[in-house]
Every structure is written in structure tokens, then in C-alpha cells.
Amino acid sequence: MAGPFSRLLSARPGLRLLALAGAGSLTAGILLRPESVGAAAAERRRLYPPSAEYPDLRKHNNCMASHLTPAVYARLCDKTTPTGWTLDQCIQTGVDNPGHPFIKTVGMVAGDEETYEVFAELFDPVIQERHNGYDPRTMKHTTDLDASKIRSGYFDERYVLSSRVRTGRSIRGLSLPPACTRAERREVERVVVDALSGLKGDLAGRYYRLSEMTEAEQQQLIDDHFLFDKPVSPLLTAAGMARDWPDARGIWHNNEKSFLIWVNEEDHTRVISMEKGGNMKRVFERFCRGLKEVEKLIQERGWEFMWNERLGYILTCPSNLGTGLRAGVHIKLPLLSKDNRFPKILENLRLQKRGTGGVDTAATGSVFDISNLDRLGKSEVELVQLVIDGVNYLIDCERRLERGQDIRIPPPLVHSKH
């Protein structure tokens, strides 16, 4: 890619250098020898056939396990990406974590942008299952950040406690969190924080490093749902994303804490717009405006986000490809949540239920985190509208149950072909 940004350069066969030009001076340091790493792994594996290395997935319930046949494993197990990332590293989190009480997890992660190409034979069918039939081999993803297209984005606040829209973005040229070195992780932090310093007006704010916070300060931000949790999730730890914690991790937020950027958790960045109450339209308007400004500031400094027309924005987990967008609400549903039709209603509306505190938590006081299930194949505007329409349907069901009336399961939404 053209431009004075940090990138991996081949200095001589077998050696990779990190050229740091974005800071105004050139600094070079040896990162790794991915070719030798991959060669050593392949040589060791040749002592045993792929069938001897194939993981035991008989009790697993994740997308990876559904598609990783012995034949696919045999064809991919000796391949590596240019940075040395392997198939076994992709799938380890799904091998170690067979299933999840609330959702069917993906069970695999990417280590770099090239992962999705090198291991496409496994990733493509997983993506197709996870994203409601989206076929990355034949379809193209669309982006739309025009918040003026949103209709009726105001929820009844007797039910909806807070509204939030988030996405992720990855810096091209640097490995993703499961694979990044300490130097790459620190470079992500430097690039992002430098760009965010250019935000103005109601988006202006400051960056807070985890390493400079007290335990009490961290916990308060977590309890208030502003900060990501400590790296206790087995999905996170098994994928290698908790290494060196809390080095080069942090949170940036504006003065009102309504626009936030997480740095170096599951992704290089998570961009979040949130506020209490049910004004999803205002939350999405701020999200679109802030995200466009962040991307402009990143590009002005010679960097860019990982993106391609098949998969949209590239992130660590295949579940977040495309828009990377999760529009959600904290909503009280004491009656509907006890109805045995609730899971099927969510499924047909393409909505996902999480616990009050996120993916690895339970619901507290019948309050659920409800958000869009899909990220890929629909635009940001389409997904936010889907959530608005779906949440209003859930509220209508709750009201009907309050009045002693019956509810019905809506017909399933069909994936549009792009």
C-alpha cells in the first residue's frame, strides 16, 4: 500500500522489519522470522499425519466445529499467513471452548488480514452460517453511514434503559490482537491515540491507559458499562488476546462519555456511541459522525483500516466482519423473557440476547442486552433499522402479555442478496 505509514517490509529473505514512518522518523527493528516459524511447525507436524493432529470436536457446538472436517484440516494444517499464523492458532479458542449457554459462538479467530484468504476453505462456510447465508465467495458487502435514513428511532423508556451502537476497526499493516507482538500492540495504541487527539467539539476528549488506572477506577468504569471487562473470558484468553495485559490497552472518551474508543481488547479499536434512555436515532447519528471523523484522522496520518469488498471491515472474530456493527439496548422484559416463544421470536427477528453485563453474563432483573445478530451483508443503516423494528416488536409483545393477550412469532427475516 502506498503512503508513509508503518508496514512490514522484507529486508532480505526470511527477515521482516517494522518501519515506523508515521511518527516522523524511521525506526527499524527485527520482529520475527515467520517463514522459519511456519517451516518449523510444518516440519514437526510431518512426523505425524494430519489425522493424528485433528482435534476431538465430537461434543462441540460452535461454527468452526460444524465445518472443520478431517479433510479440510488436512488441506489447511500446514499453511501459514505471511506473518506465520496457522490454522491451529485460528481454531484453538473453539477447541478449548466447546459451546456457550446463550449463543452459538464462531469458535475461531484471525491473526491478521490475510487469515481470511489463506484459510478461506474453512472461514467462508463459517461466515456463511454465522451471517444468515451471506456467501463471501459471490456476494459483496455495502457500507452506509447516513443516519438521516433511520425511521422512528425512539423507544419507550419504560422498557428501554439505554441505547448503544458500536463497531470495530483494524489498522492495516499490523497483526490482529491474537497474533500481534508487544511492539505492534503499542504501535496500534500510538497511532490511534495520536489520531483521536484531533477530535473537536462534542467529540473531544482524552485517553486513559489501563496501566495508569487504579483497580477501583477500572472497576467503576466496568460497572458503569463504559470499559471492557478484565480478560477473564475463556474465549479471549484461549485466543491469546489477554497476553501482556494491561500493556497498551486503554479507553478514550469524550467529556460526556457518550462517544468512546476501546484500544487493544478483542480488536485494535472498538468505536462506541451510547447514552441512557431510548433515543437510538441520536446515538446512531453521533456514531456515524464520530466514526467518519476518526477514519479521516487515521488516514491523514498515513494509515487506513482493513477492508475489502467481500468481507467489509476486517476484524478478529468472523462474527464481526462487514459492518462490525452491534446496535443494542438494555431492555426490561419480565413477562416475554419467561415465555417459551421468546428465543424463536429473537431468532426470526435476527436479534441476539446477551446477559445484562455482556456476552458472558446472566440477565439481572429481567434486563437483557438485545442486539442485531448479523454484521455482514447488510449496511449499518439496515442493521440499526432492523434493531429498531425488532425491539419495538419485543416491546409490543411485552405490552400484550401485560394485558393478558396472546403474542405471535413473526415470520423469519430473509437475507437480502447484494
Curated annotation (Swiss-Prot):
Phosphoserine: modified positions: S152, S197, S233, S366
E.C. no: 2.7.3.2
UniProt-listed CDD domains: creatine_kinase_like
InterPro entries in the record: ATP-guanido_PTrfase, ATP-guanido_PTrfase_AS, ATP-guanido_PTrfase_cat, ATP-guanido_PTrfase_N, ATP-guanido_PTrfase_N_sf, Gln_synth/guanido_kin_cat_dom
Cell membrane is among the record's keywords: no
Entry's Gene Ontology BP terms: negative regulation of apoptotic process; negative regulation of mitochondrial outer membrane permeabilization involved in apoptotic signaling pathway; phosphocreatine biosynthetic process
Pfam families xref list: ATP-gua_Ptrans, ATP-gua_PtransN
Main location: mitochondrion
Residues bearing PTM Phosphothreonine: T214, T356
Residues annotated as binding ATP: 162-166, 225, 270, 326, 354-359, 369
PROSITE patterns in the cross-refs: PHOSPHAGEN_KINASE, PHOSPHAGEN_KINASE_C, PHOSPHAGEN_KINASE_N
Transit peptide interval: 1-39
GO MF entry, a single one: creatine kinase activity
Domain Phosphagen kinase N-terminal intervals: 46-132
Keywords assigned by UniProt, alphabetized: ATP-binding, Kinase, Membrane, Mitochondrion, Mitochondrion inner membrane, Nucleotide-binding, Phosphoprotein, Transferase, Transit peptide
Family, as annotated: Belongs to the ATP:guanido phosphotransferase family.
Further facts: Mitochondrial creatine kinase binds cardiolipin.
Function per UniProt: Reversibly catalyzes the transfer of phosphate between ATP and various phosphogens (e.g. creatine phosphate). Creatine kinase isoenzymes play a central role in energy transduction in tissues with large, fluctuating energy demands, such as skeletal muscle, heart, brain and spermatozoa.
Subunit details: Exists as an octamer composed of four MTCK homodimers.
Protein's recorded name: Creatine kinase U-type, mitochondrial
Originating gene: Ckmt1
